[in-house]
Structures are given as C-alpha cells and as structure tokens.
C-alpha cells in the first residue's frame, strides 16, 4: 500500500493556494490549508472546496511560531508549500517591518517547525520565491545563476527566505526548494495588482461604470504567465529526485502598455498612445461611439514606486529540461482573454445586482413594495 501524500499549504486562500489545492486534491492528496483568523471572510477562492472529504483548514499565522509548530505537528505533512506572504511590493515600502516578519522570518519559522517535530527527513518543502529578487537586473533573461539585486523591502525579505531555504538544505540535508516565480496572473488575482486592475477597468469602462484607468510606468517589462500552469511546476519541483531551485517563467516578455492594449481590445476598444512617460495617454480610436476620442488611460505619478523594477524576463530552460514542465501551456493572449472574459461577466453581474437594489429602494420609497 502506497503512503498517503499529505500537503500543507500556507496561503491557501490566495490565487496560487486555491489552484494548488485543486491540483493536489485531483491527484489524491489529503490537503490541509492554513488560514488566519479574521473578522473578514476572505475564503471566496476556496469556498467550492470546503466540505470535500480530503480538504481541511487550520488556523495559524506565519508571525506566530507556536501556531505553526502546532499545525505541522498535528498534520505531519509529507509536503509543505509555503505560499503565504505579504506580496505587494508597494505595501512593503509602507509596512517594511511586517513584510520582513512574514516574508523572511516566517520562512524560518516553517522550516524550524518541521525540524522541531521530527519531520526533517520526511517532509519536502517548497518556498514561493520571486523574480523581484533580481531587482535592478544585471542580465536578461534571468535564470537560476543570475545575481540578485533586490530593489524593495519585499524583495529584501524574500531574499532572506530564499537563502535560509538553501542553508537548511545544505546544513541539515532537508528537501527544501525555492521556486523563483515570475509574474503569474489569473481571474483569481487580487484586484489591487496591476493586471487585474487593468482587466477590471477595461470591463467597467466598456460597460459604462468607470471613466478612466490610472497606471504607473507603462514601460515596465514583465514575464507574465497563468497561475494555474505555475502551480503544476511547484508540484513537479517536489517530485524531483534532488532538491533544487528553479525559475518558473514563460520566457516571453511584455510591457504594461501591451497588457492594457490587449485587455481593452478584448472588450471592443482600441487604444492609441500619445505622449511620453508621465504624460502618456491611451485614447480610444475605435469602440462605442460615446468613448471614441476620449482619454481612457492616464499615467499617474502616484503609482510610481520609490524604486521600480522595470525589466523582468525569466528563462525557464531548467524547469523545462529537468521537470518536463511546459511554460507556454497558456499564451499571453489567452491569459489576458481569460481575465477579461471573467471580469466582463463579473462587472455585468454586479451592475445587474446594483440595478435591482436601486429599483427595490425606489419601490420601497414609493410604497410599491413593503
């Protein structure tokens, strides 16, 4: 009888965590997710999984070592996927101490918990690292041997997490791996991230619910992939014979401007760009008559970071060769369309619900319904 695979996922309520939970459940795993206690219900992405016999949730926090030790001791996982993080680069400038506690020391708390409960030789650990480590890049594209030059408090914290994983692998022989994730998006992406901000704005503008989209540096270059494809690579990393670190990327690069151009195209709006830098604007040249000639995208200095990483481009050669992973399962164009289609439906649904509420309020005021 084969041993039951037991996965513990931190950050299970996030974009990656929810997709990874689905993948592992489909592979027959017992999946245990770690969630934080909160007065706000943030479990929308995993609501469809709750109630399944092999899906379990536990309360713990990366800032609380005792809670982490308790969960690891109770679950006794064969694999841990540490996806929890303060993952907003901009927020890390506003909350650097919190970012360091979660993204740096939080990683240490997890691997120490594994050692303390006696699972160092039986539990494999995946750490979600980031392309932001490359920061002020010294070469393109970036691979596993490219020097790091972190350019934000978030990246600095993540660099500690990266190196402590390598240290425990070397010092204690633990199966610990870093996945250096380049930007990966989906219809489950948080609405404050630039890609989701763009697709939601395009949908709202197309449906008459928003006038304009404000963005930061349109020239920023990113390697964008589909999160659903990337979680497969996370799993493959822990199935390898030896623990190693891998770049997870598509190997294809696009600008923020290109992402916006394509998103608006998919809602039936064509943009023409005029001006440069902070004075650049996206003007509608084709689409609904009431929008033609209007400026729909503007650059705002408010969205520029104190230090900005402008050229991230990953080389997934190692993951492709050693793991057999296909980084181009979903193309850039397909990714943007998936997100736009989802947000067009979401905005339409929200608009319909708002109309019902307005009509009900009007009927109540007139005494039509009581």
Where would I find each of the regions flagged by the language model?
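N-terminal Rossmann-like NAD(P)+-binding domain of SDR-like oxidoreductases, especially those catalyzing
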Residues: 1-184, 228, 234, 238, ...
